[in-house]
């Protein structure tokens, strides 16, 4: 079996903030325009008060770091041109999810229609790490091992103790909010890529999901 390439890519989601009130601002469609909004390295997300960056495919951690420094600087400049600032945390400490506007793209409007207030409440921000593993069975084996480490990684990365103006008493309230969504959390142990494919096929045939991209486990294959 050919060893995996182990290429790296990272996506980061940021809060768009009014510098005077410190409230979230639903302003992504004004910050981004045209093709850049859909195809660029800086993209919209479910809520208009969120912006996402995505690195190119990288070969080393040093390349990833350089990409993140470049993209973080760029998104801060874009926000500053519109009199706004960027913040990074798993949740906003006091802005209300009820008043946030959904990004008017078919993908996000569909999620809002399907999941109603569960989608509206999903006002959370995160970091997603993509690792290149070409062999599907190796990928499933890696997922099975990674399941054990997910709680440890979460412990090291918590950044969301506040929600709706309250100290929740938890270090990662983000994970509690995301738990309300279907098909989330730590994935089950899977025997093989074939078993995973059968699971996805069952979900599609029964009308639970249109495709595997709607499985949102903490560790999962990429269907994009």
What are these model-predicted stretches?
Residues 88-92, 133, 157:
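Glycine-rich, histidine-containing beta strand-loop boundary motifs that form or position
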Residues 104, 134-224:
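Loop-rich catalytic cores of soluble enzymes, especially ATP-dependent carboxylate-amine ligases
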Residues 129:
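An acidic/histidine-cluster motif and surrounding catalytic segment
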Residues 1-125:
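Terminal catalytic/cofactor-binding subdomain
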Residues 58-61, 132, 136:
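Short strand->helix junction
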């Amino acid at each position: 079996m050919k060893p995996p390439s182990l290429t790296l890519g990272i996506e980061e989601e940021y809060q768009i903030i009014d510098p005077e009130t410190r409230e979230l601002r639903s302003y992504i469609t004004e910050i981004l325009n045209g093709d850049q909004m859909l195809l660029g390295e800086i993209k919209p997300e479910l809520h208009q008060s969120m912006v996402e960056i995505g690195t190119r495919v990288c070969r080393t951690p040093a390349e990833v770091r350089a990409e993140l420094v470049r993209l973080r600087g760029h998104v801060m400049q874009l926000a500053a041109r519109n009199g706004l600032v960027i913040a990074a945390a798993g949740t906003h400490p006091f802005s209300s999810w009820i008043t946030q506007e959904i990004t008017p793209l078919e993908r996000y409007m569909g999620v809002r229609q399907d999941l109603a207030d569960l989608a509206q409440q999903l006002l959370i921000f995160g970091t997603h790490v993509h690792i290149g593993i070409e062999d599907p069975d190796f990928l499933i084996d890696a997922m099975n091992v990674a399941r054990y480490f997910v709680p440890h990684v979460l412990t090291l990365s918590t950044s969301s103790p506040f929600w709706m103006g309250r100290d929740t008493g938890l270090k990662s309230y983000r994970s509690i909010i995301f738990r309300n969504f279907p098909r989330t959390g730590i994935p089950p142990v899977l025997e093989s890529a074939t078993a995973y494919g059968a699971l996805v096929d069952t979900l599609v045939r029964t009308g639970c999901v249109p495709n595997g991209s709607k499985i949102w486990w903490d560790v999962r294959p990429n269907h994009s």
